[in-house]
């Protein structure tokens, strides 16, 4: 439950900061799902596949995809207060 509350707080903080700092500063966030990094090195391929299967898109996210999402938020001058979920559909569940 603590993780869910902290994630909700981060999303709300993004919106509050965007409102408070506009129009001079835009505030957005990226909320990635299962990003395969060295942190997952201890997991077996079977464990990773089980995790991937729990997402609607049944895949993990590459670090480069998170970077691409961040670049999109930076480039889009009309976007502020948004949290871009890059989670292979996890929030759909």
Where are these regions (language model features)?
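Structural signature of beta-strand start/N-cap positions in the alpha/beta core
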Residues: 26-28
